[in-house]
Amino acid sequence: MASFKIVIVCLALLVAVASARRRDMMSDDELDYHYSKRGIPCACDSDGPDIRSASLSGIVWMGSCPSGWKKCKSYYSIVADCCNQ
């Protein structure tokens, strides 16, 4: 009887996994919009030395900058980079 219950549970899991819908892929424009809204603004080297008057044109990315973005801060950090497009 226990093996019958195990078979039923396994079949139910198989049906649940097989019928799961895949999420639609986002277009490049949607990805760019979401990338630009993600993270914390940061000051690039081109924004000037004064952080209070800087326009904060960069965005902090954990790890490294994604494709299409470039590092805009001159110092090196292992944890995060200040990047802009």
Curated annotation (Swiss-Prot):
Tissue specificity note: Expressed in ectodermal glands and in clumps outside of the extodermal layer. Is not expressed in nematocytes. In adult female tissues, shows similar expression levels in mesenteries (gametes-producing tissue), tentacles, pharynx and physa.
Gene3D superfamilies for this protein: Anthopleurin-A
Pfam families: Toxin_4
Disulfide bond is among the record's keywords: yes
Signal peptide positions (record): 1-20
Disulfide bridge map: 42-82, 44-72, 65-83
Impact reported for residue 35 to L: In Nv3-1 and Nv3-3
Domain of life the protein comes from: Eukaryota
Alphabetical list of InterPro entries matching this protein: Myo_ane_neurotoxin_sf
The UniProt record lists the keyword Signal: yes
Cellular-component GO terms for this entry: extracellular region
Alphabetical UniProt keywords: Cleavage on pair of basic residues, Disulfide bond, Ion channel impairing toxin, Neurotoxin, Secreted, Signal, Toxin, Voltage-gated sodium channel impairing toxin
Primary location class: secreted
GO molecular function, one term: toxin activity
Cell compartments where the protein resides: Secreted
Propeptide span(s): 21-36
UniProt function note: Binds to site 3 of voltage-gated sodium channels and inhibits the inactivation process. Is highly active on DmNav1/TipE (drosophila) and is only extremely weakly active on rat Nav1.4-beta-1/SCN4A-SCN1B, and on human Nav1.5-beta-1/SCN5A-beta-1. This reveals high specificity for arthropod over mammalian channels. In vivo, when released into the medium, this recombinant toxin induces impaired swimming, paralysis and death of the crustacean A.nauplii within several hours. Also causes paralysis of cherry shrimps immediately after injection at very low doses.
Further comment: Nv1 toxin seems to be encoded by 8 different genes. 4 of them code for identical precursors, whereas 4 others code for very similar precursors. In the genome draft, 6 additional loci are also correlated to Nv1 toxin, but they are not predicted to be functional genes. This high similarity may be explained by concerted evolution.
Family the entry assigns: Belongs to the sea anemone sodium channel inhibitory toxin family. Type II subfamily.
Protein name in UniProt: N.vectensis toxin 1 4
Species the sequence originates in: Nematostella vectensis (Starlet sea anemone)
